[in-house]
A protein has these predicted regions:
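Catalytic-core region of carbohydrate-active enzymes that cleave or remodel glycosidic bonds
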Residues: 101-119
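Chitinase-like catalytic core of GlcNAc-active glycosidases
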Residues: 1-105
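Surface-exposed substrate-engagement region within the catalytic domains
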Residues: 73-79, 87-88, 109, 114, ...
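Short glycine/proline-enriched coil/turn segments at helix->beta-strand junctions
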Residues: 49, 118-119, 127
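Alpha-helix capping and helix-coil boundary motifs
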Residues: 27-30, 118, 161, 165
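Glycan-binding loop/region signatures in secreted carbohydrate-active enzymes
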Residues: 128-168
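Short, surface-exposed, polar/charged, turn-prone segments marking secondary-structure boundaries
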Residues: 83, 112-116, 150-154
């Protein structure tokens, strides 16, 4: 709260991704109540100074669904304590080729979010990027490869993007 007040910020955005992506979901049942307590306590303190609290999180699905997404963020439990929910509707496919933020996935996430809080609180992060995935391996890197490339390593071929194809 001091950071917000001392810098005359409108509020603060909590973007805690470590417990979702680093700790793993085996810790989530213990982490979720602590997260909720933090959000609620910070909300009370910020609102006493007329300041905003937003949270940025990956997707969460309706708990009635078979897949729950990143349920550790407990949207339903923090909905009344936040002013904005910023949903990361990107990185659906990371390690394997696929869409970055498919519409059906984004819609499912948004439907749940607006079912538990005012739609005016819900914001989405849209992917403005693409990824290159290795699609085939041909040959080996030269022995005198530049720094950062291992000489003799397998050489990768990347799928050509639509923009590259159009420009050619």
């Amino acid at each position: 709260v001091d950071l917000v007040l001392n810098n005359n910020f409108d509020g603060i955005d909590l973007d805690y991704e470590g417990f979702a992506f680093v700790d793993g979901n085996t810790t989530w049942t213990k982490t979720a109540p602590r997260w909720v307590a933090l959000v609620k306590e910070l909300s009370v303190a910020l609102r006493s100074h007329n300041k905003l609290l937003s949270i940025s999180t990956p997707y969460v699905y309706d708990p009635k669904e078979k897949q729950k997404g990143y349920f550790v963020y407990a949207w339903a439990d923090v909905a009344s304590s936040i002013d904005r929910l910023r949903i990361m509707t990107y990185d659906y496919s990371v390690a394997k080729p696929g869409p970055i933020g498919p519409i059906s996935w984004t819609e499912k996430t948004l439907k749940y979010a607006v079912s538990i809080m005012s739609p005016s609180k819900v914001f989405i992060g849209l992917p403005g990027y693409g990824r290159d995935w290795i699609t085939s391996v041909q040959g080996k890197c030269p022995v005198n490869a530049p720094p950062g490339l291992k000489g003799g390593a397998k050489a990768a071929t990347f799928k050509t993007s639509y923009a590259d194809t159009k420009a050619a």
